[in-house]
């Protein structure tokens, strides 16, 4: 088959294009997002109304919260952010499975006795827990089996307080599939009717490590985000991967061919807002990500953060853009044109609070275009309006 490249003019916030996508979201564009955490979940809930073909590359490096307990107990990648994105993309219409959605979002009480929590888990495995009552077979049987696999492998001292049932189901499936995430994620997608594709950028059990400008080193995503511990006091100089959490052990990860194919075949690639280092740049660390992006002929869009990101101490918008390009270029040849990696910066300078204006000289140097358009509404206040953001991105496809 002979392929040609076609360029065209587009209208941002193209109502006709959006209407067409909304009528047949199953035929919607293949859009790919590099993200992690929960920052993109609201956008995902809007996006699924227009396309069921979005792909979400999610970081599996979270080292805090309930994910930390699972990672320590089973030496596995983090699954909390994967589960969160799967739920955000789940079918919420009457044709979906709200009873499974409710089960997968349920958390055990944080203040409960160990015996009571074990009884709850055992009742789910038996199928006698109230949350299992509305779930019919074969889904009921599948869920019980995955929880059973988790239960059988669970260390005697494992703390179930605050545990998310969806995470336990995913963990059981991971353990039952020879420590592979893809099979259980695929099953999860079918169980909750996920309207898109969610994949971990790597299946490797690794941790984020950062060298700070003051010369100190920290290991663990939870130490970067400023959510579970005090925010950083020195800017991040370099982000890398470590095999161990307690001691820096340099590690490399290779992008799998399945993920490479998803990146190369996307009609649009988005570097969205969220934790700049631990969500966005962390996705670019596996070898092969940058080259897969460069091989994609579609538009690549960067949406900078609004307000204050604890990971971006002292970073101007120019610095953020340069740092993004630095991590993208780390995986490609020196002669790779910048436009193979990034084409657009999407922002709202009138209503948005950015760290600084974007330099026209830098824009020209990188040969990119700035799309300055309304992305913030009164209801979204200090944040991007998810509907406006989705509208702008869909207009570029």
Segments predicted by a language model, with ranges:
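Conserved catalytic alpha/beta core of Sir2/sirtuin-type deacylases, generalized to analogous enzyme cores
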Residues: 1-31, 38-56, 65, 167-270, ...
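Electropositive, gly/pro-rich neighborhoods at or near active sites that engage anionic ligands
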Residues: 61-237
């Amino acid at each position: 088959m002979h392929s040609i490249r076609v360029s065209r003019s587009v209208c941002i916030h193209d109502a006709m294009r959006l209407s067409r996508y909304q009528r047949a979201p199953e035929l919607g564009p293949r859009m790919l997002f590099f993200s992690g955490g929960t920052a993109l979940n609201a956008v995902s809930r809007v996006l699924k109304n227009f396309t069921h073909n979005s792909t979400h590359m999610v970081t599996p490096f979270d080292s805090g919260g309930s994910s930390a307990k699972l990672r320590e107990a089973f030496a596995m990648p983090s699954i909390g952010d994967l589960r969160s994105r799967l739920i955000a993309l789940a079918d919420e219409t009457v044709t979906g499975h709200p009873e499974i959605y409710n089960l997968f979002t349920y958390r055990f009480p944080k203040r409960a006795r160990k015996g009571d929590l074990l009884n709850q888990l055992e009742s789910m495995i038996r199928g006698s827990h109230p949350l299992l009552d509305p779930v019919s077979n074969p889904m009921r049987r599948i869920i019980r089996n995955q929880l059973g696999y988790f239960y059988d492998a669970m260390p005697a001292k494992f703390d179930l307080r605050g545990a998310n049932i969806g995470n336990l189901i995913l963990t059981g499936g991971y353990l039952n599939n020879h420590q592979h995430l893809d099979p259980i994620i695929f099953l999860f997608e079918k169980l909750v009717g996920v309207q898109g594709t969610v994949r971990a950028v790597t299946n490797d059990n690794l941790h984020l490590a950062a060298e700070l400008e003051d010369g100190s080193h920290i290991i663990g995503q939870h130490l970067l985000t400023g959510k579970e511990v005090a925010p950083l006091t020195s800017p991040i100089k370099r982000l890398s991967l470590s095999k161990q959490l307690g001691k820096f052990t340099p590690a490399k990860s290779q992008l799998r061919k399945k993920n490479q194919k998803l990146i190369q075949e996307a009609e649009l690639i988005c570097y969205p807002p969220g934790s700049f280092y631990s969500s966005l740049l962390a996705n670019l660390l596996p070898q092969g990500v940058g080259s897969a992006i460069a091989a994609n002929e579609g538009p690549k869009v960067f949406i900078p953060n609004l307000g204050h990101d604890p990971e971006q101490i002292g970073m101007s918008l120019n610095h953020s853009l340069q740092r993004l390009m630095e991590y993208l270029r780390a995986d490609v040849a020196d002669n790779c044109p910048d436009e193979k990696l990034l084409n657009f910066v999407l922002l709202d300078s009138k209503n948005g609070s950015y760290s600084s204006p974007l330099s026209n000289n830098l824009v020209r140097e990188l040969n990119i275009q700035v799309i300055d358009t309304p992305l913030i509404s009164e209801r979204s206040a200090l944040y991007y309006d998810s509907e406006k953001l989705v509208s702008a991105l869909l207009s570029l496809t």
